[in-house]
Amino acid sequence: MFPALSSERVLVLIPARMAATRLPGKPLADVGGRPMIVEVARRAAAAAIGPVAVATDSEEIAAAVRAAGVTAVLTRADHPSGSDRIFEALGALDPDGAVDVVVNVQGDLPTIAPQTIRSALAPLAEPAVDIATLCAEIVVEDERTDPNVVKVVGSPLDDNLLRALYFTRATAPFGAGPLYHHIGLYAYRRPALARFVALAPSMLEQREKLEQLRALEAGMRIDVAVVDAVPLGVDTQAHLDRARAILALEAAEQK
């Protein structure tokens, strides 16, 4: 039931809600002839690491997802984060605990490559890792000082893997060397996800507005796979227009 790249059983969950203020109705915005949330689910399925489901508090999103043949789970509307939403969905889909790893893919990444999603599992080859995530080296100078670009401060384990020491909106670490742009896609060991959502928000999490700091402050280990590029996150109309252009180009190249 749970095919994966390893012996562990993996479930991919995509949290989605209709509450976006900068781009109302974002999950159902048309990209390449599909609702955005459906396009993300299609790419997650192409990663071929396990079943894919959408966790949402919206009947409208659930209906659109199901019409495309994708599993949808209706969740409570009052979750403070996507992590809480996917934890509820995990319990509904897998009450017997068969799933070992939960991959949380953001629903606003309609151009993400399936290989990028697969890369999130790589750090979990180390049994001591609780949570895996992704980053890419910053190559645009302005992003080094942009507080909207979250940086990973990490200790290199090899050329494509870091152990996360901190996440920050500041320009860090200081000095010569690469900076890394964090990509908000996570692979949780199931016990780590359960522990994470049970923790109270931490001081640094509230200060930086970055929930992954809650895990680090609690002593959980986060390792980070380095990928080639940051996938486009859609938050504005300009982002949506760019995503549509990218998908149109992909479609033209496949003809």
From Swiss-Prot:
Q: What GO cellular component term, any one, is given? A: cytosol
Q: Which InterPro entries match?
A: Cytidylyl_trans, KdsB, Nucleotide-diphossugar_trans
Q: Does the keyword Flavoprotein apply?
A: no
Q: Example GO biological process term? A: CMP-keto-3-deoxy-D-manno-octulosonic acid biosynthetic process
Pathway(s) served:
Nucleotide-sugar biosynthesis; CMP-3-deoxy-D-manno-octulosonate biosynthesis; CMP-3-deoxy-D-manno-octulosonate from 3-deoxy-D-manno-octulosonate and CTP: step 1/1; Bacterial outer membrane biogenesis; lipopolysaccharide biosynthesis
Q: Which keywords belong to this entry?
A: Cytoplasm, Lipopolysaccharide biosynthesis, Nucleotidyltransferase, Transferase
Has the keyword Nucleotidyltransferase been applied to this entry?
Answer: yes
What does it catalyze? 3-deoxy-alpha-D-manno-oct-2-ulosonate + CTP = CMP-3-deoxy-beta-D-manno-octulosonate + diphosphate
Q: Which GO terms describe its molecular function?
A: 3-deoxy-manno-octulosonate cytidylyltransferase activity
Superkingdom is Bacteria
**Pfam families the UniProt entry points to:** CTP_transf_3
Which first-to-last residue range defines the signal peptide? none
Enumerate the subcellular locations listed in this protein's record, separating them with semicolons: Cytoplasm
EC assignment: the record states: 2.7.7.38
Give the function comment from the record.
Activates KDO (a required 8-carbon sugar) for incorporation into bacterial lipopolysaccharide in Gram-negative bacteria.
* Stated family: Belongs to the KdsB family.
Q: Which PANTHER family match?
A: 3-DEOXY-MANNO-OCTULOSONATE CYTIDYLYLTRANSFERASE, 3-DEOXY-MANNO-OCTULOSONATE CYTIDYLYLTRANSFERASE, MITOCHONDRIAL
Q: Please give the NCBIfam families that the UniProt record associates with this protein.
A: kdsB, PRK05450.1-1, PRK05450.1-5
**The name this protein goes by in its record:** 3-deoxy-manno-octulosonate cytidylyltransferase
Give the originating organism: Xanthobacter autotrophicus (strain ATCC BAA-1158 / Py2)
| Lineage of source species | Bacteria, Pseudomonadati, Pseudomonadota, Alphaproteobacteria, Hyphomicrobiales
The gene from which this protein is expressed is: kdsB
